[in-house]
Amino acid sequence: MKAGDVINGYTILEDFRVVGAGLSKWTFAAKDGREYFIKEFLSPTYPDEHAPGSAQTKMRKRRRCAAFERHHRRIQEALASVSGVGGNLIVTLDFFRWGAKYYKVTEKVEAADLGPADVTALAFQDQLVLLKTVAHSLRILHDRGIVHGDLKPSNVLIKRTELGYTTKLIDFDNAYLAGEPPPPEEIVGTMNYYSPELVGYIQETGTAAHELTQKADIFALGLIYAEFLTGTPPAFDAASQYAGVAARA
């Protein structure tokens, strides 16, 4: 897909760009006079009758696709009541398959180019607004029984307003219902912000699935707060590599 192509009624405005660990691509698209952010998932891909592979292989891939669809639609439905444009949660507005690929559409956000070091330089009152707005967004999720699952500074967009700044919480691809995380081998994200219980679950060292609740996000939020206020993550034993690992030591 390239600029000018149309996907499910969305006109692609720029060529897609690969992001993160190469698991997806994104660009901007227009529909009915409004611009959107659109993400193309590189995996899974849906095999049609002409796809290579045995019938058994294609059936296995289709089962995986069905599970992928169920997961995304479940989170989308859980957040349906807060899915309007303009809020501080940038949730899925549209999710669909086009050919073999899956796509997700969200509101387009004009974010300020501010990282944790830039936030540290802001007046404390501005910092406080940022801390409060991201916490409020997280509470909306948590009140609906949803764990974000990949909370980190790059998923907290900072937007300039007439009065200063606010935050927009994005990227719910790794979200799950509290106590119902995906299998350990399917969890992806940034380990720097993993909670101790999430580390234990992934390493299969005694943490059960039901123990992964909203608390995992609160651990990550604390790390983000530290970066926003000091410019650097909290100090811990370097041998542990990650804060969540250090907290389990």
Residue ranges and their predicted role:
Residues 142-159:
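Catalytic-loop of the protein kinase fold
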Residues 159-192:
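Activation segment/activation loop of eukaryotic-type protein kinase catalytic domains
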Residues 130-131:
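Activation segment signature within eukaryotic-like protein kinase domains
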Residues 217:
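Conserved catalytic-loop aspartate of Hanks-type protein kinases
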Residues 25-73:
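ATP-binding glycine-rich loop module of kinase domains
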Residues 91-102:
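Short beta-strand micro-motifs within the conserved protein kinase catalytic domain, predominantly
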Residues 2-31:
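ATP-binding glycine-rich phosphate-binding loop
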